[in-house]
């Protein structure tokens, strides 16, 4: 485990490893993003500090390496910024600004690489936007109303086809969002109208849903986790019949607000972080019940 001390001058809101686990990007209320090189031991080196946001930076997301060394960030300033490293100079610069939202942009998430360079954003204006970065250098976006009081987070469904046809892949686009209306919603791309339509509404929380995570594994069934201010995490499963069933991760409420939830790459372990400054790990047993798999030690 690597501990990076005094990285920022204010609260750190996110820390994400790149695809290879060699670089760490962090972001903070100090309006900056920092990128560190990790060497697999306890050593790390600060590569660069990125400045460009005018407010706290809430989240960062690495693009798949097939698109280059690219990072997306979002901020209270209402912007999502796209940063790229030039391999020759190793200098980072802003290559795109996404400014369609009217309030804080709360999350950014790149689509599975099979779908192309596509970025998903949520905002306190209640809207979700999806931005396509096209091969010819142009961009196009779709923006739609999702959660009336504010959209807090969103993520992509895993791709379930090996098709290379771009039109067929676009039809595969499904996302799940969550918001301050206590709901999570599943959306499917509607090619005829070039928008996203609500496919399902996941009702079960009694307070704001702070985070949502769609498991990358969907071999047997689909799993979605939602983390809420009501101090619970719900696991939603979809079998072949298409209906979503909910289950409490644990019968006992968490000690504090559940801020984030995240699946392992294999999709069998869920990490939950909360207001008690702890990260707990959970795994489904053979009976379909979720049990503790320990905590991440600080």
Curated annotation (Swiss-Prot):
GO terms for molecular function: structural molecule activity. Its main location: membrane. Has antigenic properties. GO terms for biological process: COPII-coated vesicle budding; ERAD pathway; mRNA transport; nuclear pore localization; positive regulation of DNA-templated transcription; positive regulation of ER to Golgi vesicle-mediated transport; positive regulation of protein exit from endoplasmic reticulum; positive regulation of TOR signaling. Component of the coat protein complex II (COPII) which promotes the formation of transport vesicles from the endoplasmic reticulum (ER). The coat has two main functions, the physical deformation of the endoplasmic reticulum membrane into vesicles and the selection of cargo molecules. It also functions as a component of the nuclear pore complex (NPC). NPC components, collectively referred to as nucleoporins (NUPs), can play the role of both NPC structural components and of docking or interaction partners for transiently associated nuclear transport factors. It is found in: Cytoplasmic vesicle, COPII-coated vesicle membrane; Endoplasmic reticulum membrane; Nucleus, Nuclear pore complex. This is Protein transport protein SEC13. The gene is SEC13. It comes from Candida albicans (strain SC5314 / ATCC MYA-2876) (Yeast). It is a peripheral membrane protein. WD repeats lie at residues 7-46, 52-93, 100-141, 146-197, 204-246, 253-292. GO terms for cellular component: COPII vesicle coat; endoplasmic reticulum membrane; GATOR2 complex; nuclear pore outer ring. Belongs to the WD repeat SEC13 family. Keywords: Cytoplasmic vesicle, Endoplasmic reticulum, ER-Golgi transport, Membrane, mRNA transport, Nuclear pore complex, Nucleus, Protein transport, Repeat, Translocation, Transport, WD repeat. The COPII coat is composed of at least 5 proteins: the SEC23/24 complex, the SEC13/31 complex, and the protein SAR1. Component of the nuclear pore complex (NPC). NPC constitutes the exclusive means of nucleocytoplasmic transport. NPCs allow the passive diffusion of ions and small molecules and the active, nuclear transport receptor-mediated bidirectional transport of macromolecules such as proteins, RNAs, ribonucleoparticles (RNPs), and ribosomal subunits across the nuclear envelope. Due to its 8-fold rotational symmetry, all subunits are present with 8 copies or multiples thereof.
